[in-house]
């Protein structure tokens, strides 16, 4: 298993780095769209569609919608706002699982929820790539989320006692959340001090980082909730040793549109 994970990582890493940081404009949107389409193919299975026709049809639908959004940039703000609404709702659904299943258990509803997860993630990345310090922004959100993941892992291993959402993901603890949050805030503080941010800007950045990390946890738990309801361990086996695409990006699909929305609200990329 470890050998498989290493080989897969060595193959995918240069592709991912090249796609994220070397491609621009429509080529970048197409690259991210391909990744999101694979995620859509996996999501259709989480929604209850085992047959390839239904899964491919859903992925194609998501691809068409991404093309439409690319040609309708005036809708970007609405897409980010929709993401904020969705992740607020998703928090409630996770906290009330399994009682909440009655509201989202149907296949069509789950397909619709997939759109609310996948399309804003694509839109957020496309916007970040268009804004000042584009690659730096993409690195920033990834470092925030991955730094929080690392902090949560070690903190949870060392101190984890109180379960965060035992009916959704029994392995996660509140102590892990605190460790992840502390790691992300430490990263943000270090960057702010290095770049000489004002006290006001630093406080806003710390608040924003905390919100992004919280939402990334909700994103992770949301996919876990859908997998648990479907009786599925991994979203697919597309990435040997790593599971599926969604298993690798579940936290980022939530964090990216919220990160972009916060920057938009701060006037970073608004026209």
Curated annotation (Swiss-Prot):
Reaction(s) catalysed (UniProt annotation): a 1,2-diacyl-sn-glycero-3-phosphate + CTP + H(+) = a CDP-1,2-diacyl-sn-glycerol + diphosphate
Q: Which GO terms describe its biological process?
A: CDP-diacylglycerol biosynthetic process
Query: How does this protein lie in the membrane?
Result: Multi-pass membrane protein
Q: Does the keyword ATP-binding apply?
A: no
Keyword terms, alphabetized: Cell inner membrane, Cell membrane, Lipid biosynthesis, Lipid metabolism, Membrane, Nucleotidyltransferase, Phospholipid biosynthesis, Phospholipid metabolism, Transferase, Transmembrane, Transmembrane helix
Principal place of residence: membrane
The question of whether Lipid metabolism is a record keyword is answered with yes
Q: Which GO terms describe its cellular component?
A: plasma membrane
Q: Which InterPro entries match?
A: PC_trans (IPR000374)
Instruction: Look at the named UniProt entry and state the broad enzyme category this protein falls under.
Output: transferase
Transmembrane segments annotated in the record for this chain: 12-32, 53-73, 75-95, 111-131, 136-156, 174-194, 199-219, 251-271
Which pathway is it part of?
A: Phospholipid metabolism; CDP-diacylglycerol biosynthesis; CDP-diacylglycerol from sn-glycerol 3-phosphate: step 3/3
Give its localization. Answer: Cell inner membrane
Q: What is its EC number?
A: 2.7.7.41
Give GO terms: molecular function aspect only. phosphatidate cytidylyltransferase activity
Q: Which PANTHER family match?
A: PHOSPHATIDATE CYTIDYLYLTRANSFERASE (PTHR46382:SF1)
Q: What family is this?
A: Belongs to the CDS family.
What name has this protein been given in UniProt?
Phosphatidate cytidylyltransferase
Which organism does this record belong to?
Pseudomonas aeruginosa (strain ATCC 15692 / DSM 22644 / CIP 104116 / JCM 14847 / LMG 12228 / 1C / PRS 101 / PAO1)
